[in-house]
Design a protein with these regions (language model features):
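Glycine-rich active-site loop/strand segments that organize a redox cofactor
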Residues: 36-86
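Residue-level detector of alpha-helix initiation sites
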Residues: 1-3, 26, 151-153
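Helix-loop-beta segment of a Rossmann-like dinucleotide-binding subdomain
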Residues: 53-59, 76-101, 132, 142-144, ...
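Predominantly flavin-linked oxidoreductase catalytic cores and closely associated redox partners
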Residues: 14, 23, 98, 102-213
Length: 213
C-alpha cells in the first residue's frame, strides 16, 4: 500500500538495499479505490489537533517531519493535475492510478526491488541482529523489517490479522483498533427519501465540532 511504498522510497533514498514484498500481483489496491477512484491523496487541514490518540505527541512529530505540502510538491513534480474538493481535500483530476504510477517510479529511482504475488508465511530471528523471512518464493535474510499491511477494514482487498499476529509473536504491544469511519444506519421509513442526498452538517461531541457534507 501507500505507507509501505513511501517507507521503501525513504529507505532506498537513504541508500538502504530494499525489497518490497506483497502478496498481490498488483500493488496499491487501496489507493486505486480511494476517493471514488480519484485518490484523495492529502488534506491541507491535516493538523495534530485533529487527531484523537493516546499519544498526541506522535502526530505532532510525524506531521512536522512530513507535511501535506511535501506530498503536494511530489504530486506537482510528477505533473499530476489535482483539485480541491472541499475543506482542503485534494483529489486527482484524472485517476488514482496516477498516484500508484508515481510511487512505483519513485521506488524505482530509489532502487527498490519488488517481489509481487509472494506470500510471507513466517518471520523469525535469524540471530540477534537479523530477521529470516519465509515466503512462497524462498527465504530472505534482512537487517531491518517493516510490516506495512494496513488495517482490517477491507478484507476483500486482502486485509488479514498477519501484522497483529506477528507483533504478538515478537512481544510488540498492539493498541486495540477502534472504528474510525462508520455509517449511521437509520430504520425510520419516513427518512428513506433522504437516501443518497449529501448536505452540509455539523456534528459535535464534548468539546469537538466537525463540519462536513
Amino acid at each position: 500500500g501507500a505507507a509501505g511504498m513511501m517507507c521503501a522510497i525513504e529507505a532506498g533514498t537513504r541508500y538502504r538495499t530494499v525489497l518490497l514484498i506483497d502478496h498481490s500481483p498488483k500493488i496499491g489496491k487501496k489507493i486505486r479505490i480511494s476517493g471514488g477512484g480519484r485518490c484523495n491523496f492529502t488534506n491541507m487541514n491535516t493538523l495534530p489537533e485533529h487527531f484523537l490518540s493516546s499519544n498526541p505527541h506522535f502526530s505532532k512529530s510525524a506531521l512536522s517531519q512530513y507535511t501535506p505540502y511535501d506530498f503536494v510538491q511530489l504530486i506537482e513534480k510528477h505533473d499530476i493535475q489535482f483539485h480541491e474538493k472541499a475543506a482542503g481535500q485534494l483529489f486527482c483530476d484524472d485517476s488514482a492510478q496516477q498516484v500508484i504510477d508515481m510511487l512505483i517510479e519513485e521506488c524505482e529511482k530509489a532502487k527498490v526491488e519488488f517481489s509481487l504475488a509472494n506470500q510471507v508465511n513466517n518471520v523469525e530471528h535469524a540471530n540477534a541482529n537479523k530477521y529470516e523471512i519465509t515466503t512462497d518464493l524462498g527465504d530472505v535474510i534482512c537487517d531491518s523489517l517493516v510490516i506495512a499491511t494496513g488495517g482490517l477494514s477491507i478484507p476483500k482487498l486482502g486485509a488479514t490479522k498477519f501484522a497483529d499476529e506477528l507483533a504478538s509473536k515478537f512481544d510488540i504491544n498492539v493498541v486495540s483498533p477502534k472504528p474510525g469511519l462508520v455509517p449511521f444506519v437509520i430504520k425510520d421509513k419516513d427518512l428513506q427519501s433522504l437516501r443518497g442526498i449529501s448536505f452540509p452538517a455539523q456534528v459535535s461531541s464534548n468539546n469537538s465540532v466537525f463540519d462536513d457534507s
